[in-house]
Amino acid sequence: MNLKTLLILLSVIILSSDLRAHDFYLSVTTLKHNIKDKKLAIQIKLFINDLEESIFQEHGVSLGIWENSPIENAEYYVEKYIYSNLFLSINDNPVEIEFIELKIKTTEVTEDKVIYCELEVCNITEISSISVQNKLLLESFDSQANIVVINANGVRSTLNLDKKISEENIIYE
């Protein structure tokens, strides 16, 4: 079974269950290098209830996004959480991630809310190696899986990060 089929199967299983009380936790982070713009676009997809639970455990703050009544500085806490749990190095150099925007969508299958975080890294002319450390939600959920899809140098790579292995490196030759 190839990775794409496995991801689709896992997504169907997850999305067809009650996500407020589930045993399997998933996030998807996509990194896409745009050579023309010299940027690395980053999109993170998280279930809002899981993100809110993690932020509550870490900061003691209830964001209220799940209940459609977000607190005034909810986006600040989301940014802070992402910056403290997602780290990238390109060509063996740590890079600065810039937060662009946050979107909330409801999934059609289960009507659960998903948060999309758009970020970017500027001035990336070429990528010979990339290191990703993704600790999103790992401290809150033992079965958390963080799928990272990387599109760089015409190659698509997929990482499956979890509590045991939260960091991986890819070298392009």
Q: How does the language model describe each region?
A:
Residues 22-173:
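N-terminal soluble domains immediately following signal/targeting peptides that reside
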Residues 17-21:
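Sec/Tat signal peptide C-region and signal peptidase I cleavage site
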Residues 4-15:
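Sec-dependent N-terminal signal peptides
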